[in-house]
Design a protein with these regions (language model features):
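Structural and coupling elements of P-loop NTPases
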Residues: 1-215
Length: 215
């Protein structure tokens, strides 16, 4: 590509778009959302170099986050990657190689489209939509539904194991950590010999976990 540019002094738009799509070329843009600088250039670059994805007709979704709303209801965040998800649809993790005792089937109770803290309930979410779903208790981040592969493999693995030292009831700490483990399965919370153990990336994650537990 560089040789072609040196020879002709120009590059075909199609070649640049193809390289961006294949993650071989990374455009670098500058701007400030606060000052509304460079926003139009960013949108134009997205229009030119990020062609719309063609989604399959069969339903598929990838869970990427678990959180809780102000009332404590569990929110399972997912991106629909095929077909459409409708309120009251029955979702399952069933695969040919999934042990029967690990199979779950649950109803997507409510579909929410969030904007900050506010949300709008919708009846359906087409492919390409990011939606928060209530009613699911066992879906975890990284899990695929429908035509998606069962799990995405994390790029990083925690290598530090921490044993909690607390004067409080360890069972209460375990319960709180189990809720946080739903949001981040890599915590790998375990209970052994009366002690709670978690796996973390380092001091920064340790501080974040401590703050979340205090909250």
């Amino acid at each position: 590509l560089l040789e072609r540019y040196l020879e002709t002094g120009e590059l075909a738009e199609e070649d640049l778009t193809d390289l961006v799509r294949r993650r071989k070329l990374f455009p670098c843009l500058f701007g400030s959302a606060l000052k509304l600088e460079g926003v139009e250039a960013l949108l134009e670059a997205l229009r030119r170099h990020a062609p719309l994805r063609a989604y399959p007709a069969a339903f598929g979704a990838r869970v990427f986050k678990v959180s809780r709303d102000a009332r404590g209801a569990r929110l399972t965040w997912m991106k629909v990657t095929g077909g459409a998800l409708r309120a009251k649809d029955l979702l399952t993790n069933r695969r040919p190689d999934t042990p029967e005792e690990e199979v779950w089937e649950e109803k997507a109770d409510q579909l929410r489209l969030y904007s900050g803290e506010k949300f709008q309930p919708v009846d359906s979410a087409p492919a390409g939509t990011v939606v928060a779903v209530t009613g699911l208790s066992r879906a975890l981040p990284g899990q695929g539904l429908g035509h998606e592969t069962a799990w995405t493999v994390p790029a990083l693995e925690p290598v530090l194991a921490y044993q909690m030292q607390t004067e409080a009831d360890p069972s209460a700490a375990l319960k709180a950590l189990r809720l946080l483990e739903e949001e981040d399965p890599q915590l790998r919370v375990s209970w052994a010999a009366g002690a709670v153990r978690v796996q973390l990336m380092g001091e920064v994650q340790t501080e974040i976990l401590q703050r979340r537990l205090r909250e």
